[in-house]
Curated annotation (Swiss-Prot):
GO MF annotations in UniProt: dihydroorotate dehydrogenase (quinone) activity
Similarity comment text for this entry: Belongs to the dihydroorotate dehydrogenase family. Type 2 subfamily.
CDD domains documented for this protein: DHOD_2_like (cd04738)
One GO term of the biological process aspect: 'de novo' UMP biosynthetic process
EC class: oxidoreductase
Name of the protein in its database record: Dihydroorotate dehydrogenase (quinone)
Topological relation to the membrane, as annotated: Peripheral membrane protein
Reactions listed under catalytic activity: (S)-dihydroorotate + a quinone = orotate + a quinol
Organism in which the protein naturally occurs: Deinococcus deserti (strain DSM 17065 / CIP 109153 / LMG 22923 / VCD115)
ATP-binding recorded as keyword: no
Keywords on record: Cell membrane, Flavoprotein, FMN, Membrane, Oxidoreductase, Pyrimidine biosynthesis
């Protein structure tokens, strides 16, 4: 139904208008009594081979929702009901900001890709805190992707402010230093700058742990796919030196190699199918560089169970999707979940953790 009816209708709309319509509809469904439970019956059945415990939380599926789709955390119950094993909200900044001028989101259907230059549009950390506080009992871990406001000169203070505001509603923090749409942000990936920033964030999580006596959420960092190999290695090492607890590989790319659609010249970060191979190779690099010391989360061009499995075998403990959800529809997480179980069975692997890094 999605491909035949809903997708053609949505693709007649401006990409951002369709985005808002979809998220608002899911937010409404999240508030309907009984709807999430009913939708959950349509998702893939639980599979103990895919269940993992990471950072003290249970992940019933390794397939999560990447940041950017539900920036303000308004539809977490709906995304959980669709079968995602975790949901990453944001990117959130301390203060609300409108982001860049529209149009700023573009579909490239022949390339199964998106280009965005959103610019961290969001309602701010206080609003997100209120939204997540109202969730009640959660069925999946909720990660919070944090960034800096566009006009902030001292970046660390914004990341620390997000931790202070959201500490008790986040199951994990993701430090976003790799969006190409905030001036100067990617410079924070340089080894020394990244290590200093992550130390500031980790110091704040420790301070909050002591203040609240609540277990500190893990801190992960999200890296870009456009770094030179030596710079990527230095960034990974800087993150490890700081004590980060996970890596997300990778964010959107500035590359336009192989694109055919007219929108290929639009400024912004490219996501979707063109990143499949590149991001998988970077997951493998990250796994080798860390020697499996911290979990790696693979994201970029995952359209099927085969794509997800390739990233897992390259070294990803978890994977995330976003652009493919736009093209494949709400049944995608359940299809990937079922397919991963079949692939493990095919390869005679008893649990997904035993597949992590098998090809690294």
């Amino acid at each position: 139904m999605y491909r035949r009816v809903i997708k053609p209708a949505l693709f007649r709309l401006d990409a951002e208008d369709a985005h808002h319509l979809t998220v608002n509809a899911l937010a409404l469904m999240s508030r309907l009594p009984g709807w999430p439970a009913a939708a959950r019956r349509l998702s893939a059945p639980a599979d103990s081979r895919l269940m993992q415990t990471l950072w003290g939380h249970t992940y019933a599926s390794p397939v999560g929702l990447a940041a950017g789709l539900d920036k303000n955390g308004v539809a977490v119950p709906a995304f959980s009901a669709l079968g995602f094993g975790f949901v990453e909200v944001g990117t959130v900044t301390p203060q609300p900001q409108p982001g860049n001028d529209r149009p700023r989101l573009f579909r490239l259907p022949p390339d199964e890709a998106l280009i965005n230059r959103m610019g961290f549009n969001n309602a701010g950390a206080a609003a997100l805190r209120g939204q997540l506080s109202r969730l009640g009992r959660r069925t999946v871990p909720v990660w919070v992707n944090i960034g800096k406001n566009k006009l902030t000169e001292e970046a660390a203070q914004d990341y620390v402010a997000c931790v202070q505001e959201l500490y008790d509603v986040a199951d994990a923090f993701v430090v976003n230093v790799s969006s190409p749409n905030t001036p100067g942000l990617r410079a924070l990936q340089a080894s020394a700058e990244l290590e200093a920033l992550l130390r500031a964030v980790l110091n704040e999580t420790e301070a909050q742990r002591l203040r609240t006596a609540r277990r500190a959420p893990p801190v992960l960092v999200k890296l870009a796919p456009d770094l030179h190999p030596a710079d990527f290695e230095a960034s990974v090492q800087g993150a490890l030196n700081a004590g980060v607890q996970g890596l997300i590989v990778s964010n959107t790319t500035l590359s336009r190699d192989g694109l055919t659609h007219a929108h290929r010249e639009q400024a912004g970060g490219l996501s979707g199918r063109p990143l499949t191979g590149r991001s998988t190779a970077l997951v493998q690099d990250a796994y080798r560089l860390t020697r499996g010391a911290v979990p790696v989360v693979g994201v970029g061009g995952i359209f099927s169970a085969d794509d997800a499995y390739a990233k897992i075998r390259a070294g990803a403990s978890l994977v995330e999707v976003y652009s493919s959800l736009i093209y494949e529809g709400p049944g995608l997480p359940a299809r990937i979940h079922r397919g991963l179980g079949q692939l493990l069975e095919r390869d005679g692997i008893s649990h997904v953790r035993d597949a992590v890094g098998a090809d690294a």
